[in-house]
Amino acid sequence: LMSNLSVSTPAVTIDMQCASALMSIEMAYTHIASGVMNSAIAGGIESSSLQPDRIYATEDDRDGLYKVAQFTPQDRSPLAMLEGAERTIHKHNITKEELYPYIIGSHQRATKALDNSFLQSYIMPFSINGKKCVDECIRPKMNEKLLSRMKPLLGKDSITNAGNACLTHDGAAFVYISNEKGPFRIHSIMPWAGNPQFSPEGALESTKAILKRTDLTMDDMDVVEWNEAFAIIDALFDKSYPDHMGKYNMLGGALAYGHPYGCSGAILALHCMAALESCNGRYGLCAIAGAGGTGTALIMERI
């Protein structure tokens, strides 16, 4: 209602946690493909800095204030996502030190993308009180020594820390989708669901599912964008597709840029477009794992 769009423009809010923006793209795509719409703006907005405290109703057996939604009936922990990452790390026998290269590499690639303006045409300039807003958590000098000093978040023996888990950010990202020919087209998109106890596996499993459904392989992909909410997600890609790390998160990922939950899926799509243009590629794959064991994957084609 604060935009210059007509008040007669239909709108809907989607809550699929981390996968929300990519799911909004899926919904827009299916509406257009079915003829319900001719065009749509899809994506998301997240303001983590204004995340409100909420309180359960007096009739609810749950009590007190909370900030984080309850993702499964059995788990009320506000640290559910961190705990899911920790479980996934141990399930796949990954050490803290094995995660270092993925973290450092993400920051280095993000720094290179920033220095070379690879994303400049995809980022709208934004200022507050005359001060230009920039990505604040890219660390060009991220190194193993710094990572080794980071304190565990889930007890002294845990691996998950502020280095191998993304920061929460404010952000907004959108794509315009229509039934007219453009520089990119959606080849296929699909949701996925699995065990919420190991939610970071959603990016890998949704990738496997969409490749199987489309009869494509990782060899066909020129660019892969996964939301690296945790470095274990990078490790899962490396273990599953070791020969394809060169096409993975080419411009850096959420470990460097941060993860504004509601819009990260649209950020993936925009990064995928920019990366396809930079490498003159054809197919790009985006995948994101979401809270509660959800996920979404998308394959786009550069025309």
Where are the predicted features?
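Conserved catalytic cysteine-centered active-site region
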Residues: 1-37, 76-80, 141-167, 240-272, ...
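Beta-strand segments within the central parallel beta-sheet cores of soluble alpha/beta enzyme folds
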Residues: 12-16, 40-46, 98-105, 123-128, ...
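Active-site-proximal alpha-helical scaffold in enzymes
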Residues: 15-46, 89-119, 175-180, 260-281, ...
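Flexible glycine-/small-residue-enriched beta->alpha junction loops
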Residues: 39-87
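Short acidic, glycine/serine/threonine-rich loops at helix termini
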Residues: 50-56, 197-199, 260-261, 295-301
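Active-site pocket-lining segment
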Residues: 86, 187-256
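Condensing-enzyme catalytic core mediating Claisen C-C bond formation in acyl metabolism
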Residues: 90, 144-201, 205, 209-213, ...
